[in-house]
Amino acid sequence: MKNNWRRRLARWFLIAVAVAFLITALPVVAMRWMDPWYSAFMMDAALDASRSGKTHYHTDYRWADLEQISPHAAVAVIAAEDQFFPFHMGFDFKSIREAVRSNEKQAKRKRPKVRGASTISQQVAKNLFLWPGRSYVRKGLEAYFTLLIELTWPKERIIEVYLNVAQFGDGVYGVEAAAQRFYKMPAARLGRYEAATMAAVLPNPITFKVNAPSNYVVKRRDWILAQMRGLGGAAYLDELENPTEPPKTGARARIEAKRK
């Protein structure tokens, strides 16, 4: 009798796991071809604005295919956020270890932990499917969705979705909406300067402004421009389809040299 109960419990557990996997995996697989109408972060921000009584809040989200986006925009966000994006499977473990060490040093000095190591794939996972905040549960789900995305989407699709769901201002999502809002031009016409400025606010697009850059944003923009040159500019996007070993020149080599 007791064995029958255990078998039934195990069977229901396996069924529950299978159902949970299907419910979470199907949207990820579908979004390889279907453009997302909304993201979890957009929904959370809209709900927060409603609770706060922000009656004039508006979500500005305009999808643009990768071919309709300046290659400078893709290179800028890769240079700013995840220079080894073409070469990893969603997680940059060396950057994670460096971030842990850096934040431990900051903690000893009683300073805030300021360094993160989220890859572009991880940011897509949390922006699309999860909620803001920090917890072990959310980080576990983020890792799960990141792995699903990397297994089912090509790199070109990951960067395309990222460029469309990343936040560049209060209620402004995606490079098309940001380009139209801040530069009065379509994303296809963004130059290196505009793209680097937009990428410079990504750590905190509410505090930092594309149209009113602080000293920090200006310095970060200039750093991103230098990194874009070191990566080889738009030619670096060829690595998304046919990744090779990172060359020994440019920004990637300098980072790799520090890691060894």
For each feature predicted by the language model, list its residue ranges.
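Juxtamembrane regions of bacterial inner-membrane/periplasmic proteins
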Residues: 2-260
